[in-house]
Amino acid sequence: MKKSSLALMMMGLIASSATQAAEVYNKNGNKLDVYGKVKAMHYMSDYDSKDGDQTYVRFGIKGETQINDDLTGYGRWESEFSGNKTESDSSQKTRLAFAGVKVKNYGSFDYGRNLGALYDVEAWTDMFPEFGGDSSAQTDNFMTKRASGLATYRNTDFFGVVDGLDLTLQYQGKNEGREAKKQNGDGFGTSLSYDFGGSDFAVSAAYTSSDRTNDQNLLARGAKKAEAWATGLKYDANNIYLATMYSETRKMTPISGGFANKAQNFEAVAQYQFDFGLRPSLGYVLSKGKDIEGVGSEDLVNYIDVGVTYYFNKNMNAFVDYKINQLKSDNKLGINDDDIVAVGMTYQF
């Protein structure tokens, strides 16, 4: 394989973890793909709860059926299993589980556990070898990342009229009966992105608004509606990847005792893919809480990330990722300020 071909392959692989799916069935308009990875990883940190083995296995299935010339049905399921637990400790979790239909030139609609609309922007900077993407995106935190009860409409190239213009409309149903910080009321979200084609630049923006549950409103910090908006910019060409994101959340970002009334979030990443498989990475993540009861302003997340990944081929890589924590040791919310170094190898298919 030519070196330039290897670099192009790595760029495509990084852009979508699911591109490595192996086709196991394709007949009579029905197709089934499987994908997954084993990430053998160790954390080194003075923070005891983070220090040690972090190995996990991730597995997914994607299927589709051709109903007619214009209509396609599809579904996806993805799960994760911890590799650092005892055999008697059940640690499986469902990451994604949704099904829907796609109409030619009109977009797709699906329902289930999926990615929130705000993550359409946040995903551009969630590219570090291990860390990153955690200033405002958190699992089961309204529509900032993976969440349940999402009805999602997606349209690419805006009905076939504008190349590179993608639209998402999303509704999230109420989720109660769980930890208050993981709950949500009814909400909606939207995102819009535009790829400038020959320039290799893209811009995106997203907005979400949700009711908060009664349990959430009883917490000491945060009240009323939860809202967020985000905007991002990326450049992806010539073996270079650059991306930045800014977002604001209101009564949405979880902290000790409830939610921050406001959080301002910034992320940036720069990476270069060498022809021989090496990919260095430099990034920065900041989330600053504002108007917090009894606290005022305080950094919630603040770190520099330095990492490197070496791709042996499209299926195997080794990495080191160093999270250099910039939080103050005496921060008023008691957030841990220790550094973390992640070292590991990943096999994916």
Swiss-Prot record:
GO terms for cellular component: cell outer membrane; pore complex. Pfam families: Porin_1. It is found in: Cell outer membrane. It is a multi-pass membrane protein. Keywords: Cell outer membrane, Ion transport, Membrane, Porin, Signal, Stress response, Transmembrane, Transmembrane beta strand, Transport. InterPro entries: Gram-neg_bact_OMP (IPR050298), Gram_neg_porin_domain (IPR033900), Porin_dom_sf (IPR023614), Porin_gammaproteobac (IPR001897), Porin_Gram-ve (IPR001702), Porin_Gram-ve_CS (IPR013793). GO terms for biological process: monoatomic ion transmembrane transport. Its main location: membrane. Transmembrane segments: none annotated. It comes from the Bacteria. GO terms for molecular function: porin activity. Induction: By phosphate starvation. Residues 1-21 form the signal peptide. Gene3D superfamilies: Porin. Belongs to the Gram-negative porin family. PANTHER family: OUTER MEMBRANE PORIN PHOE, PROTEIN YDDL-RELATED. Homotrimer. Uptake of inorganic phosphate, phosphorylated compounds, and some other negatively charged solutes. This is Outer membrane porin PhoE. The lineage of its organism: Bacteria, Pseudomonadati, Pseudomonadota, Gammaproteobacteria, Enterobacterales.
